[in-house]
Amino acid sequence: MIYFNSERVEVKKFPNGESLIHSENLKVRSDDNEIRVYFENDEDITHLMFLKSHLDELRIKCNLILPYMPYSRMDRTEGITIFTLKHLCKLINNLNFESVTIYEPHSEVSTALLDRAKVVNMSKMLAERLLKELDNGKEEVYLVYPDAGAAKRYGKEIGYEKILTASKERDFKTGFIKKLEINGCVESKSFRAIIVDDLCSKGGTFMLTASKLKEMGATEIYLVVTHCENTVFQGELLTSDLITGIYTTNSILSKDHKKIKVYEI
């Protein structure tokens, strides 16, 4: 789904599936024009290429906003798999945007490969906002990082002392987590916890983390992620009593639930 200057770009289909993009409704500004891509599927990349090429012909400069950077998971070559993120970044660079803004990239490789890239640390902002909401002086609040990568990333971004970090052991053949432990000390018998990460799919890791936190005395457990996929409805996060609420954005998520608070970006 593509927006140009906050207006959704109209795309129709020919009978054979080819796209027909209407340009007469594009509201062009004198400066600071922007294309915003809410990635749903690979068609969005094709439409982005067509729209930017059209604007180039009109000599209209433009910035690109990516609430979610597509193909961030494929940030390296493993065996015979294709380094998809590298090739997508090359395509975006060739479109020659004035700037490319990414919200909470899943991989730092994205910003390394993109020209004129800017990053919005959205999970940091969401976590800090929730910390203020929960700070009532009655129960201690701990930030919980679900793995070493999250601890390294958000430990630098968020200035907060009460930290717990999970360490996990995976079965490399199946991908399932065999063991998970919480590292760090809790000073009181009861506390509230905020798990912070960038992305949630079905939420298996977060369920295991929350289960361990409950054993340690957590009374309320919140999950903060910038990107929440619709597959969260296929997992147990929303049906279990372990998670009190999920704080996320509309970068990917397109469904509603009473336990999910969505911030628009």
Predicted features along the sequence, with ranges:
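PRPP-associated nucleotide enzymes
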Residues: 1-265
